[in-house]
Amino acid sequence: MKLPLSPSTEPVATEPLGMALLSSILAAWSYISENPERAALYFVSGVCIGLFLTLAALVMRISCHTDCRRGPRRRCLQDRECSDSSDSEDGSEDTASDLSVRRHRRFERTLNKNVFTSAEELERAQRLEERERIIREIWMNGQPEVPGTRSLNRYY
């Protein structure tokens, strides 16, 4: 289907880009001023969706960070079944039990690591723990023991 050609050869006047932007801004302003509740709802919904997507991306990055960094070599060394057949290609298909075992091993490795590099840091940490324990005991012993049947209001 052919469209008829326009008889005039004059170029069609186009709006300048600045005027179109100004017109769009004014239209948005009038919509917001006429419907403030709806505009607020759209804004809050957009912020919530953005936060949800950011949270999902962070969770995925944190949970997959160590699994994605591992190469097939490390996987083979941990499983003690390193073969050059299609096993290295199928290594990405982990079961839930393998993942839980790997996480448990990783947790045990972090427990066995020495966090403190010097004896001074270790001594400081022990003193800090002792101080926190003493403060906690003082706090717990300083609280009045209120029986369960009595009212919590002291001034009556």
Swiss-Prot record:
Keywords: Apoptosis, Autophagy, Endoplasmic reticulum, Lysosome, Membrane, Phosphoprotein, Transmembrane, Transmembrane helix. The keyword Transmembrane helix applies. GO terms for cellular component: endoplasmic reticulum membrane; lysosomal membrane; plasma membrane. It is a single-pass membrane protein. It is found in: Endoplasmic reticulum membrane; Lysosome membrane. Residues 79-100 are annotated as: Disordered. GO terms for biological process: apoptotic process; autophagy; cardiac left ventricle morphogenesis; connective tissue replacement; energy reserve metabolic process; heart development; lung development; post-embryonic development. The modification Phosphothreonine is found at residue 110. InterPro entries: EVA1_A/B, EVA1_dom. The chain crosses the membrane at residues 40-60. Residues 84-96 have a biased composition (Acidic residues). The modification Phosphoserine is found at residue 118. It holds the Pfam family FAM176. Its main location: endoplasmic reticulum. Belongs to the EVA1 family. Acts as a regulator of programmed cell death, mediating both autophagy and apoptosis. This is Protein eva-1 homolog A. It comes from Mus musculus. The lineage of its organism: Eukaryota, Metazoa, Chordata, Craniata, Vertebrata.
